[in-house]
């Protein structure tokens, strides 16, 4: 570049314009990584509407307590803050369900990565299992948590005759 500028200074003024046009074509900015910026999406987009409840099901008066969250898309070529949230939610491995509470702090994180995940409500047809029954539970692909009850052996009473 210094050699080109030295030639420009030595040349007559008429040739200066043709050389500067050639220098502009040499400068290419395609290799520069442009900075990611957060999208400025208005908050009203994230507010629930009655049409959403009709479309996706659910009752706004009695919301479910737990979410089943599954990552369905890759985090490659995604911004760093989306990768951080995926790691916070424990969704590094794809198609592995994670259970999260339905609270505002968790929901705010889920909104940021909602295009990468699938969210289903956790249905408890037999109610919330006790601590001793947690090892006997099975999570179905439909989103139901089924408690597998084990039969206890009946004690035989001795008959005296």
From Swiss-Prot:
GO terms for biological process: mitochondrial translation. SUPFAM superfamilies: Ribosomal protein L30p/L7e. The keyword Transit peptide applies. Keywords: Mitochondrion, Ribonucleoprotein, Ribosomal protein, Transit peptide. The keyword Membrane does not apply. It is found in: Mitochondrion. It comes from the Eukaryota. Residues 1-34 form a transit peptide. Its main location: mitochondrion. Gene3D superfamilies: Ribosomal protein L30, ferredoxin-like fold domain. InterPro entries: Ribo_uL30_ferredoxin-like_sf (IPR036919), Ribosomal_uL30_bac-type (IPR005996), Ribosomal_uL30_ferredoxin-like (IPR016082). GO terms for molecular function: structural constituent of ribosome. It holds the Pfam family Ribosomal_L30. GO terms for cellular component: mitochondrial inner membrane; mitochondrial large ribosomal subunit; mitochondrion. PANTHER family: LARGE RIBOSOMAL SUBUNIT PROTEIN UL30M, MITOCHONDRIAL RIBOSOMAL PROTEIN L30. Component of the mitochondrial large ribosomal subunit (mt-LSU). Mature mammalian 55S mitochondrial ribosomes consist of a small (28S) and a large (39S) subunit. The 28S small subunit contains a 12S ribosomal RNA (12S mt-rRNA) and 30 different proteins. The 39S large subunit contains a 16S rRNA (16S mt-rRNA), a copy of mitochondrial valine transfer RNA (mt-tRNA(Val)), which plays an integral structural role, and 52 different proteins. This is Large ribosomal subunit protein uL30m.
């Amino acid at each position: 570049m210094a050699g080109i500028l030295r030639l420009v200074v030595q040349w007559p003024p008429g040739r200066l314009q043709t050389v500067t046009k050639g220098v502009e074509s040499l400068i290419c900015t395609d290799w520069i990584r442009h900075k990611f910026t957060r999208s400025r999406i208005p908050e009203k987009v994230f507010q629930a509407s009655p049409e959403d409840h009709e479309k996706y099901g659910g009752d706004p008066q009695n919301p479910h307590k737990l979410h089943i969250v599954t990552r369905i898309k890759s985090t490659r070529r995604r911004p760093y803050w989306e990768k951080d949230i995926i790691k916070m939610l424990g969704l590094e491995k794809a198609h592995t369900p994670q259970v999260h509470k339905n609270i505002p702090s968790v929901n705010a994180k889920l909104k940021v990565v909602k295009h990468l995940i699938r969210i289903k409500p956790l249905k408890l047809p037999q109610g919330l299992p006790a601590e001793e029954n947690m090892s006997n539970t099975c999570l179905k692909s439909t989103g139901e948590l089924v408690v597998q009850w084990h039969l206890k052996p009946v004690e035989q009473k001795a008959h005296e005759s």
